[in-house]
Each structure stands twice: as C-alpha cells, then as structure tokens.
Amino acid sequence: MDKVQYYRRKSLPLEMHKICIVQKTRIPSVEERVSAIREAGFNSYCLRSEDVYLDMLTDSGVNAMTNEQLGAMMVGDDSYAGSATYYRLAAKIKEIFNKDYFLPVHQGRACEHMLALAFVQPKPGSIVPMNFQFGTSVGKIKYCGGDYVICLQEDGLNRQSSNPFKGDFDLEKLERVLKEQGDNIAFVRIESGTNLIGGQPIALDNMLAVSELCKKYGVLSILDASLLQDNLYFIKTRETAYSDKSIREIVRTLSDAMDIIYFSARKLGFGRGGAIILNDKKLFEHIKTFVSSFEGFPTFGGMSVKEMEAICVGLDDTMDENIIAQGPQFIEYLCNELEDAGIPVVTPPGGLGCHLDAMKFVPHIARKDYPAGSLAAAIYIA
C-alpha cells in the first residue's frame, strides 16, 4: 500500500487512480445556505442537492467506476434465464469467496429481507445476536416477528479509544445468549465493519471465534460483508497475525468460516446490487423461493446485468491492496489533522468517513436536542 514518505514530515497517502471525467459544482453563498437550511427545517437530510457544494452523505451506489468496469458493462447478457452475465459473476464469487451458490438481489437491504423471511419469520419471537445493529437489518428482523441482541464488546461505544477493533463481539455475552436462547436463535449476524459506531472494524480472529461458537451451538453464522473492503485493510494493517497474508487469503479464511455471506454491492464491488452467497444447497433452495417472489428471476434478482458485469470487475478490484487502502488512509489523515487542530473526532480512525464527536464539539446541546444534527446544520452554514 503506497505512501509518500517525507524526510522530515509525516507520510501522505496517495490517490492510486487517474480522474478522467469531472463534474462541475458551485458553492452557494452564505445567504443561499441560510435560506436553504431554514427551508429544510434545519435538517441536512432535507436539503436539495443543488444547494450542497460537498455531499458527504451520499456514499454508496454513486461512486466513480473504473474504465474496466465501464467497459465490462457493455457485454452484459440480458437473457432472462441462463444469462452469461450471471455465470460470470457466480464464477468470480466462487473464485474469491469459495462459495458455490449465489443469489443476486437489488441491494443490501433486500438480502436482509430474504434472510429474515427465510430464518426469522418461521420462528416468531426468535432472536438474532449481533455485534451491532444497523437500521435496515433490525427493521427486517422485527418486521418478520423477531428481535435482536447486541453483543458488542465493552469498548465499542467509547468514542475515544486506542482499541484497533472496536467492532468485536463480547464472546462471553454471545455464548451466554446462545445458551439461554437455545433453539430460539434464528442466526448470528456479524457486521464487518461496524457502520453506526464510526466504521470500526472487527478482528478476523474475533469473527473466527464467533463462527466456532455458532458451530458449537448449532446456529447459522451470517456475515454482513457490505463494509468488508475497509475491514480487510484494517485486518491486514492492525492484526499482526495476518500482516503477511494477501487480501485474497484473508477473504478465503473468513469466508470458509461463515455459513452465509451477504453484501450490498454498492459498497463491496462498486455497483448497484447485492448478493447472498453460501455452500449449503438446501439453504440455497430455501432462500431462492423468496428471491423469486420479491426480487426477480434468480439469475438477476432485480439487478441490471450491466451492474452485475461491473460488480464482477469491482470484486476483483477489492482484492487490490492499493484500492482498499484509499478510504482508510485518507480518513486517518483527516482525523489526525482535525485532532491536531483540537477538533474532537471518533478514534481510532475507522472506515466510511472521519466522524466528528458531536457530544464534545457542542457539549451545551443536550442529546435530546440532536447535537449531531445541529452541528451538521451549523457546518453547512459556515
């Protein structure tokens, strides 16, 4: 993973790509911004895109694509059944993840819907332990009559910490839940990395230990690999046992331990879509019935074949250390610069973005008054 190392100064990350197409933008005046945020009810989510100079909200599905991805989109096979595009993507998934069966869906939350229908709905009141919750995940679980238990390790919610893997499971708590709930467990969900606590990663050894507990208690282990790209970088650079392993080797080790993997290809693969992958043919056939009912024919699942071709290339790109290093390295650089300026941020730097610690930034605003939302509105105006 390449960096520029100065003789007297700290290193700087490099952008390992060329930019071929640019899009013009503009900075609205202060008066325009005040008017826009007032019209939006001081809710940055309600701003119009033309009133925003730098969009730091829209992350997935709008990323730039490589020239190889754009080229691949031109060879998509639109056949309703037996599409060559499906088989190309299935072969790529087999190559990288060593999983025999692949179900395409239109995006990550659709994966969660299919899995909740398959494993939660048949057992009303069932429980899904997880390292941390994500809105769409728990929404689908509850919609299908289940509930969830967070088993995040104690340090996970500390906003300032030196713990390199704040997304780890508390293994003792997980085992306690598995013992107490027994047959009432639908599956264990492992989020890699952990979105809502600042993109914090989970260690590979921790995920392998979770897998062993699942095997011990006869429970399915299901990996949400949507944010796996950043997590792979952190395993490679923070987990010394795997520092000499290639990204492909790390992925294979993790994948072999999991019963089912799903992901939003908007994050993993740089395209608009999603996938559920597994090795158990009986489970595959069970989940496939829901894909056919809710998503589309099992060889495209509501995805455009152009996007499927792009994802095929994008998954290969995810195995490139220089590509997956881009986000974490620049996020770390920004976090360090802000910390040097006395601005409170979530540490250690994670994936997704550099997260300001709003509770420390605006301590005079009570939690019930939405300090983070208030801070976002103020930064927009400033």
Predicted segment positions?
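Conserved PLP-binding catalytic core of the aspartate aminotransferase-like
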Residues: 344-382
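Conserved PLP-enzyme active-site core in the AAT-like
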Residues: 2-42, 46-52, 56-64, 69, ...
